[in-house]
Regions:
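Local sequence-structure signature of Cys/Sec-based thiol-disulfide redox active-site neighborhoods
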Residues: 18-46
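Flexible, solvent-exposed short loops/turns enriched in glycine
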Residues: 49-50, 64, 84-88
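Hydrophobic h-region of N-terminal signal peptides that target proteins for export
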Residues: 9-18
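Structural micro-motif
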Residues: 60-71
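Short, acidic, Ser/Thr-enriched surface-loop or helix-capping motifs
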Residues: 15, 71-72
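Positively charged n-region of N-terminal signal peptides that target proteins for export
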Residues: 1-4
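Non-catalytic, surface beta->alpha helical segment in thiol-disulfide oxidoreductase systems
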Residues: 73-106
């Protein structure tokens, strides 16, 4: 019985986790002063990674850092916010939060 409850708990936790929108911020170590503070964002799993830790194909596809990638529960990229020439993301927290809310309604 204990094992059955454990399995059910893991499956439910996995299902609940898979319903989340994921935000991945990728930046370079030399640009860490321009990391975007995502602590105010709700309704999404927030992750951070350095560019050097990404596979080469992803490293080569990123033209500017930092970049914020918003993915739906299926892992599909729904929106990207990319730094401008100042190496900073100009999007507001409200813009990012609104995008998360929009994706969660789909």
């Amino acid at each position: 019985m204990k094992k059955l409850l454990s399995v059910i708990f893991v499956l439910v936790a996995g299902f609940v986790y898979s319903q989340d929108v994921t935000i991945l911020q990728i930046n370079a170590e030399w640009n860490k002063k321009n990391n975007y503070d995502l602590s105010e964002i709700t309704g999404a799993v927030v992750k951070f990674s350095y560019l050097k830790d990404q596979p080469l194909d992803i490293q080569n596809s990123i033209m500017a850092v930092p970049v914020i990638v918003i993915m739906d529960k299926n892992g599909r990229i729904r929106r990207q916010f990319i730094a401008d020439i100042s190496l900073q993301i100009k999007a507001t927290h409200l813009e990012i939060q609104n995008e998360i809310n929009r994706i969660k309604k789909l």
